[in-house]
Amino acid sequence: MPTFATPAPITAAVQVAGAQVRVTASDRTDTVVLVEPINEASASDLKVASKTEVDFAGGQLTVKTTVSGDKRGSVAIAIDLPADSRLVANLAYSSVHADGPLGACELHMASGQVQLDHIDALQANIAAGEVAIGHIARRANIDGGGFVMRIGEAKGTVGLSSSGGQAWIGHAFADLDLSSGSGNFDIDRADASITATTASGAIRIGRLTHGQAKLMSGSGDIEVGISEDTAASIDVNSERGAVHDSVSSQGNSEPSDHRVMVHARTRHGDIIIQRAAS
């Protein structure tokens, strides 16, 4: 079990194929790595584990599978490291599960699953796979193919570009710039401006409290909820669909310090503008 003295946060670079990786970040002054075959009775799993390289130099931990594992997973890798360490992961049919606070993270995924707890920032290129992140403190830049992205809280701006898939954000505190060829966007709450464009997909904002929403879908429904205490300027149109705008029909009877603007267009689909559920 390799152990390295690390009194400060480090960079953990993981390059794996057919691996299950677990990262635990906590208040500690060393880094410990454990590499084990998932099936000790499997000669191929034993080979992948024995050929996995672990090295530490210049503040960077490197873990690399030199022999590709099975797509079901051949090697289990556990990394315990200092809180706020950076994670750089290159993954092929692998999974990463991280607990505890990490610094800036960089993901390059051919396929796989990633679950991160609390990170500082994100740079990601995802060909395929699923990513779930509890909290991002600063900027996130995400691009790739058809993937599923879930973010509980985004404190910084988010830029996302994909060919397809789905993106869900629980609470966006800063601006969002989202685009997809055939993806769906689902935002529970947005406290800043949103630009969302998809050629074929649905766009939903559960609650918009501030800023401007510019929403465009070639084929798909659009739904926006607006807070009760927020005045709204609405400009929406569907070429081949129904428009239900209960906010404009109610008017803004009382002065409000909060105002949002909604500009929405879809060619094939319905548009719903309504007051957000309390």
List each language-model region with its residue ranges.
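Intrinsically disordered, low-complexity terminal regions
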Residues: M1-S278
